[in-house]
Amino acid sequence: MDLIAEPNLKELINSTTHKWIFVGGKGGVGKTTSSCSISIQMALAQPKKQFLLISTDPAHNLSDAFGEKFGKDARKVTGMDNLSCMEIDPSAALKDMNDMSVAQNDKNDGFSDLLQGGGLAELTGSIPGIDEALSFMEVMKHIKRQEEGEGEKYDTVIFDTAPTGHTLRFLQLPQTLSQLLQKFGEIAGRFGPMLNSLTGGGQNMDIMGKVDELKANVEKIREQFTNPDMTTFVCVCISEFLSLYETERLIQELMSYEMDVNSIIVNQLLFADDDAEHNCRRCQARWNMQKKYLDQIGELYDDFHVVKMPLCAGEIRGLNNLKKFSQFLNKEYDPVADNKIIYELEEQK
């Protein structure tokens, strides 16, 4: 007899093996709220462990969701001892790369002059997919710090990802980089001496060593991302045709990358049949539409954890509101017993 997946994320929230959790889907479906909710519930369920929530979306929303400012360095969420947040800023990361390159290069060569003028940042800033590449570099830096015992040690990292297209490019990077580095290694092996002479003459750049080290790091991430005990992807959608269609496309892509995906959060549900006091014709009509697509989700993903989350009367912002909302990831929302909670959110300034 097949086991039926529970309609909650209790198993993931209490997981002791997952290092990487990605949360993603179509734009505007509640990805940030969902990633914040997962992070909060995991931190509450496992108080002795440390969790890090990273935004890889250029339109950062973590600061807005929690009502406090986060930046490129991890910082604890006020009121949570074991949950930190950070927002990767591609433009700041490019400036850091440029400044680092200036410091490492000979001040008398022409390449250094180019960098002094912000040449690297200007050159790379317009490359398609640079945001995803920089996000991936942050992952690699994080793994390296963990292995070397530097900084805060995090047991699980949760990613609040960009809309689907950006996320897929991000997840393709380990495979793409691995192939690229293989080719680059072959070229560097043949033309290494010539490349050294072109980069300033006096410096003996260990190109092959750098490439091999980068390849090893990329391969390590590939192995972790495709290990279902270490990495999983939580899809977020709303109960409408376009969102369902994009979720199916995302799941098929994730499976082609051999990445584990077995959870879907369906946001903004009205549950109008059980809310007679606040029901209206428009609410009932939309709920009837939502039920149609919920049935399709149930048929398509009968072996997934499908979590049905309510549409709240107010904004889900601030730690207290996020705690109230996130409890329904752990315990299914009951439209009758839990009805009052969605009308009792604190108003945020």
UniProtKB/Swiss-Prot annotation:
Catalytic center residues: D57
Residues at which ATP binds: K26, G27, G28, V29, G30, K31, T32, T33, E240, N267
UniProt xrefs under InterPro entries: Anion-transp_ATPase-like_dom (IPR025723), ATPase_ArsA/GET3 (IPR016300), ATPase_ArsA/GET3_euk (IPR027542), P-loop_NTPase (IPR027417)
Major subcellular site: cytoplasm
GO CC terms, sorted: GET complex; Golgi apparatus
Role description: ATPase required for the post-translational delivery of tail-anchored (TA) proteins to the endoplasmic reticulum. Recognizes and selectively binds the transmembrane domain of TA proteins in the cytosol. This complex then targets to the endoplasmic reticulum by membrane-bound receptors GET1 and GET2, where the tail-anchored protein is released for insertion. This process is regulated by ATP binding and hydrolysis. ATP binding drives the homodimer towards the closed dimer state, facilitating recognition of newly synthesized TA membrane proteins. ATP hydrolysis is required for insertion.
Subunit structure of this chain's protein: Homodimer. Component of the Golgi to ER traffic (GET) complex, which is composed of GET1, GET2 and GET3. Within the complex, GET1 and GET2 form a heterotetramer which is stabilized by phosphatidylinositol binding and which binds to the GET3 homodimer. Interacts with the chloride channel protein GEF1.
Protein name, per record: ATPase GET3
Record organism: Lachancea thermotolerans (strain ATCC 56472 / CBS 6340 / NRRL Y-8284)
Gene that encodes the chain: GET3
